[in-house]
Amino acid sequence: METATLVAISISRSLVSFTGYALYTAFGQPSEQLRDPFEEHED
């Protein structure tokens, strides 16, 4: 394989991994530990 193909595949894999981790943090089990600033400051 060419170098450009390997670089493109590795960058794509990194972006997909980061997106998956962000979705897991936002909606998965760790989301229970996140605080909601809008609920804390009711006006």
Curated annotation (Swiss-Prot):
Coiled coil: none annotated. It is found in: Plastid, Chloroplast thylakoid membrane. One of its GO terms (cellular component) is chloroplast thylakoid membrane. GO terms for biological process: photosynthesis. Pfam families: PsbN (PF02468). The chain crosses the membrane at residues 7-24. The keyword Metal-binding does not apply. It is a single-pass membrane protein. The keyword Membrane applies. Keywords: Chloroplast, Membrane, Plastid, Thylakoid, Transmembrane, Transmembrane helix. Belongs to the PsbN family. May play a role in photosystem I and II biogenesis. HAMAP family: PSII_PsbN. This is Protein PsbN. The lineage of its organism: Eukaryota, Viridiplantae, Streptophyta, Embryophyta, Tracheophyta.
